[in-house]
Amino acid sequence: MIFDKDNFKEFDQELWQAIHDEEIRQQNNIELIASENVVSKAVMAAQGSVLTNKYAEGYPSHRYYGGTDCVDVVESLAIERAKTLFNAEFANVQPHSGSQANAAAYMALIEPGDTVLGMDLAAGGHLTHGASVSFSGKTYHFVSYSVDPKTEMLDYDNILKIAQETQPKLIVAGASAYSRIIDFEKFRQIADAVDAYLMVDMAHIAGLVASGHHPSPIPYAHVTTTTTHKTLRGPRGGLILTNDEAIAKKINSAVFPGLQGGPLEHVIAAKAVALKEALDPSFKIYGEDIIKNAQAMAKVFKEDDDFHLISDGTDNHLFLVDVTKVIENGKKAQNVLEEVNITLNKNSIPFERLSPFKTSGIRIGTPAITSRGMGVEESRRIAELMIKALKNHENQDILTEVRQEIKSLTDAFPLYEN
């Protein structure tokens, strides 16, 4: 039978092999991509359930299809858990991704052509915060704020100045490569000063907000968006939160029928599982460990004069390092580290001088290694091995030594037990 899972290997050997190879790759690699994590078997089980068969346009109790009693329960569980976890009045769990969550928020709050103030991509923002190649930059008139050239941290006085000069209808706070605490209260004060909406994209830090290790944007933002993966450790998807009932209605209309048709109820079920996991007291320990591991790794780079640690440290799950004193660019650093089974991504740094295809920096994140059970000791050692590989990137003997030690680490901390 085609639908017999046990027959999958025989039915589609080529696809089975690709998936199997990816599982082996994940097991044998140290994953330091800040936006990646390791979900539980329960999350995967929910996402692989019969819910993938069901179409359910609309919202719980207001569907355009019959036979939705069960998926109504599933989606309602996800909604209530999201509201509880983040202490929000309203939640929409249907966005297929963080980008679509952002698109829905824009659609609900502003009109095409309106001015929006968002974080510059090179300073740590996201494509959907106004990059010219993104729908956001094509649909709305984005102006950007950056970081202070000396501290490489947000300069709220300068952001206020830009807001007063440009009079945006919406201000977007949040980042994809910023390692410091974001003061959402100050952002709301800036938004109020120019009569703008405040939207917070907390995709990268949602898990840390949930665990209590980063201030929550919910009391200050008119709308908060996030992904459900990254530090939240759920399936790949989006989520929108607000405390404003009128805005919530606009958000719901923007998601469906504005941007999407049928929701992915199997993914929503997996979101519900991840949200329940995040409500468990153990998740607070997980959030704390993510930050401890990131700070331990960052300290190793900070103590080496051949590397520049952006903003001189980290308060969250990630940090950026300028590698150009030891290797030509971030792209080459990424490739060298991949040779020794350490996966991360090249990344632009503030006031970047190289192209985004090369970059001066790399971005390093600890959610995935923390999920595997690695701690401060392992994090320090991984950073030391990274430095060893980068400084000796033309020495195959040393790269082999590093690769072997990485294998010992990954063997000691399996991706999944049994």
Curated annotation (Swiss-Prot):
Regions crossing the membrane: none
EC code: 2.1.2.1
A GO CC annotation given for this chain: cytosol
InterPro entries, sorted: PyrdxlP-dep_Trfase, PyrdxlP-dep_Trfase_major, PyrdxlP-dep_Trfase_small, Ser_HO-MeTrfase, Ser_HO-MeTrfase-like, Ser_HO-MeTrfase_PLP_BS, SHMT-like_dom
Gene Ontology process terms (BP): glycine biosynthetic process from serine; tetrahydrofolate interconversion
Binding residues for (6S)-5,6,7,8-tetrahydrofolate: 121, 125-127, 355-357
Main EC class the enzyme belongs to: transferase
Cofactor requirements of the protein: pyridoxal 5'-phosphate
HAMAP family, sorted: SHMT
Subunit text: Homodimer.
Functional note: Catalyzes the reversible interconversion of serine and glycine with tetrahydrofolate (THF) serving as the one-carbon carrier. This reaction serves as the major source of one-carbon groups required for the biosynthesis of purines, thymidylate, methionine, and other important biomolecules. Also exhibits THF-independent aldolase activity toward beta-hydroxyamino acids, producing glycine and aldehydes, via a retro-aldol mechanism.
Family indicated by similarity: Belongs to the SHMT family.
The name this protein goes by in its record: Serine hydroxymethyltransferase
Source organism of the structure: Streptococcus agalactiae serotype III (strain NEM316)
Gene name per UniProt: glyA
